[in-house]
Amino acid sequence: VLASQSVSDDIRDDLETMELNTNRLLDLVNQLLDFRKTETQGFQLNFVECDVSELLQKTYKRFKPLARERGLALSIETPESLYASVDREGLTKIISNLLTNAIKYSETYIRIRLYSEGERLLLSVCNDGLVIPVEMREEIFKPFIQYKTGTLRSVPGTGIGLALARSLAELHEGTLCMEDSMENNCFLLSLPLRH
C-alpha cells in the first residue's frame, strides 16, 4: 500500500506511523519473550568462535543513523579483531540494548570501547546523559525499572532492555554493571573469552 502512488500523503504518513508503531510493539514483545526465556532457562546459547570487533562494528553501523538523527556524536574504539567464544545473537542483543539505552538518554555523545584484559572481553558504553545516582545503579537492571527525574525529558520504553542485557551477560558467565563515575554513565560488559 505504501508503494502505491494513488495513496494521499496524509494516508501515507498515517500508514508509515502505523508501521513504525507495529515494529516497536513487535520489538517490545520479542524483548519480553527473550527476557522470560532467560529467566526460565529457555534461552539456549550457541557458543561459537566469533570476531567480536566485527560483530560490534556491524551493530554500530545499524545505530549510527539513529545517533546522528538525535545529534549525538557516536565514537567507537575497537581492535582490528578480537576473538571470543560467544553466542552471536545473545551478544548482539546485549550491545543493541546498551546502544538503544545510550541513544535514549545521552545529551551529546556516546563512546563505545571494546578491549580485553587477561581472559576477559570488556565492552564499555558511555554517555553524557543525566548521571544516574549510585543508589539507582542496581535498580535500573531490574525489569520494568527506568530512572526518571523531573529534569529528564520523557523517554519512551518499558525498562526491559537493561534487565535483558544483564540476563544475557549472566548466561554468558559474565557481568554487566555501571562503572563508578560521577561524570557520565558508563556501562561495562565483561565476558570470558573462552567457554
Where on the chain are the PLM-derived regions?
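Short alpha-helical segment of the dimerization/phosphotransfer core of two-component systems
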Residues: 20-25
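Helix-loop junction within the histidine kinase core
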Residues: 36-47
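Conserved catalytic submotifs in the C-terminal HATPase_c
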Residues: 46-51, 68, 73-82
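Short beta-strand/loop element within the Bergerat-fold HATPase_c
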Residues: 109-119
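Short conserved segment of the HATPase_c
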Residues: 132-144
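Short alpha-helical Gxxx[C/S/T] motif in the catalytic ATP-binding
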Residues: 156, 161, 165
